[in-house]
């Protein structure tokens, strides 16, 4: 953990950060002030910290390495003259695995926030300081002591309750005990509003987390591989889709939501969730070769079709990123096509009923 982020991942993280900012400017015509980012423990292990590097870079902070190695011994502020853009406020939603595995990185991220908050810079180039000053003022009016208000205003790392895992959304969708996106957003906020840092471990701060969500203009999740996509695991929609629903619930509007890919460290790519969904739909879900490959696996292959439909629906329920043509094409290929439907029914009757 003390070799994260590595020098190599720092380069990738800077590239991811620059491309995220560029894409948002392209979409909205302005630089983002507040970003909500997902951090997975497994991805952190695989990449040696691409996500951590990006978060630090967005805040305008970089690692200090020992001599020529990758051992991180501290952080330093990137001067504004070198950064050439404002310091962006980043809220991090970590997974349970990350919480358990990387407490040292939680403290590193906390240190980054502390460094930036102490800078004598105008608020228009330091959005972390801007948000903290506003929040401290609000908390003082609510009766908090100054030291406590300052402490709360620096909270940026959040996750599920200690000893638990997940995002609270998947269970709700599968149980059908929900009616609106707001229900899903509230569930995500309730499950994710536990702050982590050097002096607190899972403290429930739902009001504070809701404020962070309300200000978030962007949600982003990075990938380091092309071997799995966002329609292959329910983790994707429960964590990222749930995050989108939480921002919508807290702010009343949808954030710009992106999926970045750093499988080629020399050429990272970023797409909106809608663009990524459309790409997966055309390249895999509707590709005859995919279904033919599933047929070799009988019962399990038919189950994969049903699982795909569940995940697709989960994304639409949380993020409303599906388009009508996608539902039409899935129905046409797997339900209305008699040959395909009968194969699924023969190999796994429960799968075809669930898809219906």
Predicted regions and their residues:
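Ligand/cofactor-recognition surfaces for anionic moieties
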Residues: 1-356
């Amino acid at each position: 953990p003390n070799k994260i982020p590595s020098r190599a991942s720092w380069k990738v993280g800077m590239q991811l950060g620059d491309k995220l900012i560029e894409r948002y400017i392209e979409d909205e015509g302005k630089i983002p002030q507040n970003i909500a980012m997902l951090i997975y423990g497994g991805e952190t292990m695989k990449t040696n910290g691409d996500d951590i590097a990006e978060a630090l870079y967005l805040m305008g902070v970089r690692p200090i390495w020992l001599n020529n190695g990758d051992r991180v011994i501290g952080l330093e502020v990137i001067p504004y003259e070198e950064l050439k853009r404002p310091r962006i406020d980043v809220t991090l939603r970590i997974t349970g695995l990350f919480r358990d595995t990387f407490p040292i990185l939680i403290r590193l991220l906390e240190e980054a926030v502390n460094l930036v908050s102490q800078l004598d810079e105008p608020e228009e180039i330091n959005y972390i300081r801007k948000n903290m000053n506003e929040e401290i003022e609000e908390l003082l009016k609510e009766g908090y002591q100054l030291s406590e208000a300052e402490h709360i205003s620096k909270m940026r790392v959040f996750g599920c309750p200690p000893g638990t895992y997940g995002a609270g959304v998947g269970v709700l969708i599968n149980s059908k005990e929900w009616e609106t996106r707001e229900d899903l957003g509230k569930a995500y906020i309730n499950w994710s509003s536990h702050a982590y840092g050097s002096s607190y471990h899972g403290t429930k701060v739902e009001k504070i987390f809701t404020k962070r969500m309300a200000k978030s203009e962007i949600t982003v999740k990075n990938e380091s591989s092309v071997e799995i996509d966002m329609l292959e695991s329910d983790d994707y929609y429960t964590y990222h889709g749930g995050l989108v629903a939480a921002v919508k619930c807290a702010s009343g509007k949808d954030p710009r939501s992106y999926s970045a890919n750093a499988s080629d460290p020399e050429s990272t790519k970023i797409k909106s969730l809608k663009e990524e969904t459309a790409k997966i739909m055309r390249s895999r879900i509707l590709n005859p070769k995919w279904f033919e490959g599933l047929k070799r696996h009988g019962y399990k292959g038919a189950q994969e079709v049903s699982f795909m439909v569940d995940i697709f629906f989960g994304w639409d329920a949380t993020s409303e990123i599906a388009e009508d043509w996608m539902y039409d094409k899935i129905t046409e290929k797997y339900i209305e096509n008699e040959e395909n439907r009968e194969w699924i029914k023969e190999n796994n009757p429960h799968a075809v009923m669930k898809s219906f």
